[in-house]
From Swiss-Prot:
Role noted for this protein: Mediates selective neuronal growth and axon targeting. Probably serves as a recognition molecule for the formation of limbic connections.
One Gene Ontology cellular component: plasma membrane
Protein name: Limbic system-associated membrane protein
Species name: Gallus gallus
Similarity field: Belongs to the immunoglobulin superfamily. IgLON family.
């Protein structure tokens, strides 16, 4: 807001005299005859605003006023604001320049001109536009599958920014008209990932921020690879599972947990676990069980190591035939890192 200076008491008679000469007695500035309608000037925050005013001759007495009071009376500056100056590119111009415009400068400004014939006023309404700026957005969150999720994105700007949400996937859906809040009911694992909030108006480029949503879900076996191998050769059984958090794996043979020993080695990395047999013997042939577990659940799959030529073609299958006590024990063991 353009501030107004207080005149020194010693100068008060002179100031009053000047104002009496400038403004007709008994005629308020805002009640004089209007020769022009109100002009609107739109300026972006931080730019310079030029409010134009012209007089008919050099003998005219001129003043600039706003809702706070007098800014300039003739050549005398009443405002304390250093951003405000007169713009006089010709003898008949009496324009007002406001640098680094801010929102509190918005409002009506009046150029009052006292000529030899009658007073005139010209009104200008300054509109300050503000680029969009996201002021608050939800933090990254982790939820369990099936939960309800509400994401919040708040933005400031003039005109008021339009907010849109978008799920950042190759086929990401754009949620139009959601305003500040994006609600996801019964979230699924496919809805995990980054969500982008965009705040836009016509003043400047949109402001964009992101929030990551992590969805926890229990393991699901995505691949279980059985294999054949001759005695004396190496063999490999592979088990993969999808889960968040990343699953832990265990291997069983005839209800007995397998450890990396006696020619057997287990390598688990991320969502994959490998059971490797260094030197296949007759006792290695048969059924193996891969168990994947995290804090939300446990699942298993049966895989086979068989002799070449037996005709068994089996890429493994999810099996529920494993005793429940084994699944429960596996989950407990995995969660306790036994």
């Amino acid at each position: 807001m353009v501030a107004r200076a207080q005149p020194d008491r010693k100068q008060l008679p002179l100031v009053l005299l000047r104002l009496l000469c400038l403004l007709p007695t008994g005629l308020p500035v805002r009640s004089v005859d209007f020769t022009r309608g109100t002009d609107n000037i739109t300026v972006r925050q931080g730019d310079t605003a030029i409010l134009r005013c012209f007089v008919e001759d050099r003998s005219s007495k001129v003043a600039w006023l706003n809702r706070s009071g007098i800014i300039f009376a003739g050549e005398d500056k009443w405002s304390l604001d250093p951003r405000v100056e007169l713009e006089k590119r010709s003898p008949l111009e009496y324009s007002l320049r406001i640098q680094k415009v801010d929102v509190y400068d918005e409002g009506s400004y009046t150029c009052s001109v006292q000529t030899q014939h009658h007073p005139k006023t010209s009104q200008v309404y300054l509109i300050v536009q503000v680029p969009p700026k996201i002021s608050n957005i939800s933090s990254d969150i982790t939820v369990n599958e099936g939960s309800n999720v509400t994401l919040v994105c708040m933005a400031n700007g003039r005109p008021e920014p339009v907010i849109t949400w978008r799920h950042l996937t190759p086929t990401g859906k754009e949620f139009e008209g959601e305003e500040e809040y994006l609600e996801i009911l019964g979230i699924t694992r496919e809805q995990s990932g980054k969500y982008e909030c965009k705040a836009a108006n016509e003043v400047a480029s949109a402001d964009v921020k992101q929030v990551r949503v992590t969805v926890n879900y229990p393991p699901t076996i995505t691949e279980s690879k059985s294999n054949e191998a001759a005695t004396g050769r190496q063999a490999l059984l592979r088990c993969e599972a999808s889960a968040v958090p990343t699953p832990d794996f265990e291997w069983y043979r005839d209800d007995t947990r397998i450890n990396s020993a006696n020619g057997l080695e287990i390598k688990s990395t991320g969502s994959q676990s490998l059971l490797m047999v260094a030197n296949v013997t007759e006792e290695h042939y048969g059924n193996y069980t891969c168990v994947a577990a995290n804090k939300l659940g446990v699942t298993n799959a049966s895989l086979y190591l068989y002799r070449p030529g037996t005709g068994r073609v089996d890429n493994g299958s999810v099996s529920l035939a494993v005793p429940l006590w084994l699944l429960a024990a596996s989950l407990l063991c995995l969660l306790s890192k036994c």
